[in-house]
Amino acid sequence: GAETVTKLIGNAIVAFADFPDQWQKLREDRSKIPAAIEELLRYEAPSQYQVRTTTRDVTLHGITIPADSAVLLLTASATRDERMFPDPDRLDIDRERKMGFNLAFGYGVHSCLGAALARMESRIALDALLDLLPDYDVDRAGLKRVAMSNVAGWSNVPVRKRV
C-alpha cells in the first residue's frame, strides 16, 4: 500500500502541472481534495491492472474463456472509457461521478482493504503540498518512471517552486 500511495502523489504532482487550472481550484477550495483524489485515481491510478482467474467458462463477444484461465483486467483503460467519462483524457476534479465508478482499488470482494487509509494519506499529502508548493513547475527532464510492472508512477518527480 505504501508504494501505491507514493506513486499516486507523484502522479498528482505531474497531473496538476499538466492541468494547472485544476491545481488552482484546489488552492481556492481545499474541500475539493477528496474529489481530486477520486479523479486522480481515475485519471492515472498507481494500479493499472488486476489479474483474476475464471471459475467457470465465460463467453464474451463470442469468445469463450475457459474455466481456470487468467484474465487481465485493464482498469486503467476502463477509467478512460469515453462512454463512461466524458473527455476522459482530461483531469477534472469537478467531474460528475454518477456514471463511472472508481476501479482503482478493485471491486466487490476484491476491493483493497487499505483503500480508506490510502485515501486519507493522499488527502493529507495533497493538503500539505498545497502549503509547500502553491505554485510549482515540474522539471520534465528529470522525471523517471518506476521500473515495476504492478505499479505505475514516478520514482523521481523534480519540482521547482515558483516564488
Predicted regions and their residues:
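Cytochrome P450
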Residues: 2-163
